[in-house]
Amino acid sequence: MKGLVIKNTGSWYQVKTDDGQLVECKIKGNFRLKGIRSTNPVAVGDRVQIILNQEGTAFISEIEDRKNYIIRRSSNLSKQSHILAANLDQCMLVVTVNYPETSTTFIDRFLASAEAYRVPVKILFNKVDAYDEDELHYLDSLITLYTQIGYPCFKISALTGEGVDAIREELKGRVTLFSGHSGVGKSTLINALVPGLEVKTAEISAYHNKGMHTTTFSEMFPVPGDGYIIDTPGIKGFGTFDMEEEEIGHYFPEIFKTSANCKYGNCTHRQEPGCAVRKAVEEHYISESRYTSYLSMLEDKEEGKYRAAY
């Protein structure tokens, strides 16, 4: 029997079978995906084969080939990865310039990982109703930056409804992963997009100005227009996984394009003479924040924080 994984609670997976049944499934202890050492070998969005047992539950026996997936390192020094979701048409990264602040480093690491696994990303700048003049000016500068690179950007307020209709249109006929820090308003936005869903939300911690985790597991919801949303737990940091040092620049489109003009084919864009990328940063054709994010990923790689999957 075949089906779609629509919910993952850690030890159990909820599968919607092709004939419409909802079946609670487990995986066998030795289940591994070839080439991936992951804390969750099965992810929401996976197409699977299941074997029913007498209790009405089932085992997942096989995963169909994935179109793509989004993966992050489980923790800073971990050799294992965590797959956020699989078989995506797009990601929507929900960010805020305050309450709490989403750093450009976090944004860039997420974008680089999505580039590596061929998942298009749209950036949703939420809480535009809450910002002062300086914050709105900074937000506009970020929108200019990421739009020029090629990432569609949207200004929204999940609270007031500003921009929500435009996002609703973008969901039609697509499987969309929603991701971002805790507290950026992801669950509030999903509730605004799909009335009646009532995904649990929480207030921002006033003491730390950080969000509190409300979604504790990944889950897929249908949306009007034959689309699906995958809601994931808020994440503090985004450790990219399974990237070789020489590949990292490939996942920054503007750095990759400019690197064709570097003197050396294996230029890492740090100290090498004749580096077109460094020159472009100095002349403000490449954003300094993007270049800083690129360097931080190289530095982490050198410190051994990025490990090849096996």
Curated annotation (Swiss-Prot):
Domain CP-type G: 77-238
UniProt organism field: Bacteroides fragilis (strain ATCC 25285 / DSM 2151 / CCUG 4856 / JCM 11019 / LMG 10263 / NCTC 9343 / Onslow / VPI 2553 / EN-2)
GO cellular component: cytoplasm
PROSITE patterns: ENGC_GTPASE, G_CP
Binding site for Zn(2+): 262, 267, 269, 275
Classification via Pfam families: RsgA_GTPase, RsgA_N
Protein name, per record: Small ribosomal subunit biogenesis GTPase RsgA
Any Gene Ontology biological process: ribosomal small subunit biogenesis
Main location: cytoplasm
Subunit structure: Monomer. Associates with 30S ribosomal subunit, binds 16S rRNA.
GO MF entry, a single one: metal ion binding
Gene that produces this protein: rsgA
PANTHER family the UniProt entry points to: SMALL RIBOSOMAL SUBUNIT BIOGENESIS GTPASE RSGA, SMALL RIBOSOMAL SUBUNIT BIOGENESIS GTPASE RSGA 1, MITOCHONDRIAL-RELATED
Binding site residues for GTP: 126-129, 180-188
